[in-house]
Amino acid sequence: MFIIASEQTRELDRLQKYLDKLGQPYRVFVTNLETDLDQQTESLATFFTQKDPVSKIGKPLFFNDLAVPELWECWTLGITTYLFDGEERRANVVLREDILSRTVERVEWFGQREEIVSIDVYNRYGWRSKQSLLTEAGQSYLDIYLNRQQEEVLLHFVSQGTFLLQTPKGRDRLYANKKELQRAVLEQVLPEDEAVLLMDKALLDVVKEKPKERLAYCASDAHDLDEIKEQVSQILLVEDGLLREKK
């Protein structure tokens, strides 16, 4: 089964747990740019940056293992962790949800007066998967998506909304917007003969070429499903951890 969602949601989490219990194999594709995903899930960004299976092997980076210049130190005060160059703080180290593990989620680098000028994001496999460059107002103007070798693969020029894919052979490709990028990726990942389960009705448009018999839709409630019924063969309801089929 091939599952398409806009993002990782509670409903998707519940569905995955249910399929795991049944021993039902599945793959998940989320149409956002998340880079911290499990081995069964792919996104618009990881489609380009984590093609090598080795990319999804590893464990979260322990904070003391951060690569920093010689003589720099990683200091911790309670749950606050930062990089210190011997004279001043150079970055905040934000830890992953499991605080006691002391593993890195992101590093917020300082410019002058401890204003954050860039952010490095680390995934669950222990390597830097994204870098965001920030304006003086603290907004990202360029998001850089990296592979495990730390090569810049996909660039997102945030204010323009454009994407630049950089390939090893130098055949770079420009995408005018996220919708164009999404269309190009889904053309490659949508299976020919596998059942497709949609988690967001906004995604119905991207699979309109697929036979209705191969499409299903997963909803969190039974409201406003009449139009969707005409486009898919089955509708599944995920309600408070229960999964049932709606005829």
Regions found by a protein language model. Name each.
Residues 1-67, 148-247:
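Long terminal segments
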Residues 70-181:
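Repetitive, compositionally biased segments used for assembly/scaffolding
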